[in-house]
Amino acid sequence: MKKIDIIGENYFGKWDRTRTSCRGIIINDNNILLSYETLTDTWMIPGGGLEENETEKDCCIREISEETGIIVETSDCLLEIDEYYENYKFINKYFFCKPIEKTEIKLTENERRVGMTSRWLSVTKAIDIFSKYDFYKNNDEEKRGMYLRELTSLAELL
């Protein structure tokens, strides 16, 4: 498994907080399933935080199910991208996923508030969206970093 570090411009030089997330890449006929926040106009690869006593694969399966309503099978972890912002280290584990069946979407209160939905986009369109990460350099470091992370994951895995 390859590991890549992304250092944010606002990184303090050391971290004392860590969050691990697991993300699933689902491809079908050269389209990729992405999560989309309608309120913030933000795209991302589906996934979320690892819970206590949960395996990374189980986290990926749960998060994709909750956000997209699709139950998946996962590969082993193929890529880890560690991001450093302020005093945080964000560990992102990426998996390839295969859809198995549909289930009920179970969004968190925050995901409902930002209007999260899932949408299929061409891989080319997704890469185009994420490649504009530098547009957010001076006004939204979180979004800039997220788009750089997602672009990096697609460049490494596709």
Place the predicted regions along the sequence by residue:
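Short acidic, glycine/proline-rich loop/turn micro-motifs
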Residues: 46-48, 107, 131-133
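A short coil-to-beta-strand element that immediately follows conserved catalytic motifs
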Residues: 71-80
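Active-site-adjacent beta-strand/loop module that shapes the phosphate/pyrophosphate-binding cleft
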Residues: 83-106, 119, 123-124
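Nudix hydrolase/Nudix homology domain
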Residues: 41, 111-158
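Conserved Nudix-box catalytic region and its N-terminal flanking loop in Nudix hydrolases
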Residues: 27-66
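Active-site beta-strand termini and strand-to-loop segments that position acidic
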Residues: 26-29, 97-99
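Acidic, metal-coordinating catalytic segment for phosphate/diphosphate chemistry
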Residues: 1-23
